Amino acid sequence: MAISKEEVLEYIGSLSVLELSELVKMFEEKFGVSATPTVVAGAAVAGGAVAESEEKTDFNVILADSGAEKIKVIKVVREITGLGLKEAKDATEKTPHVLKEGVNKEEAETIKKKLEEVGAKVEIK
């Protein structure tokens, strides 16, 4: 009588951790394989280099400091983000604060220019 795959799985499931570890070692010796995962270090490094060489297309506009003219900054933040008065005020008080995410470079520069004109400090990342 042949043993079914389900019976093998049942048996393996009933083994203790120590017995299972010994079974793995036996498989490694008998079949000349290793249970440790192989890591391809070169692929990870190459992927990082490719990402750095590509020009970034999505930028985040971050309000680093609202400066002395807070009311003017709040008005510009409302204009840019469409936030209500309270939300815009909170955004200018809790700096650094991400105002816009995933915008193109041109739009990010325009937003930065508007905010800097009213005395805010802005970062683009």
Swiss-Prot record:
GO terms for molecular function: mRNA binding; structural constituent of ribosome. InterPro entries: Ribosomal_bL12, Ribosomal_bL12_C, Ribosomal_bL12_C/ClpS-like, Ribosomal_bL12_oligo, Ribosomal_bL12_oligo_N_sf. The keyword Ribonucleoprotein applies. Pfam families: Ribosomal_L12, Ribosomal_L12_N. Keywords: Ribonucleoprotein, Ribosomal protein. Gene3D superfamilies: 3.30.1390.10, Single helix bin (1.20.5.710). It comes from the Bacteria. CDD domains: Ribosomal_L7_L12. One of its GO terms (biological process) is translation. GO terms for cellular component: cytosolic large ribosomal subunit. HAMAP family: Ribosomal_bL12. Forms part of the ribosomal stalk which helps the ribosome interact with GTP-bound translation factors. Is thus essential for accurate translation. Belongs to the bacterial ribosomal protein bL12 family. Homodimer. Part of the ribosomal stalk of the 50S ribosomal subunit. Forms a multimeric L10(L12)X complex, where L10 forms an elongated spine to which 2 to 4 L12 dimers bind in a sequential fashion. Binds GTP-bound translation factors. This is Large ribosomal subunit protein bL12.
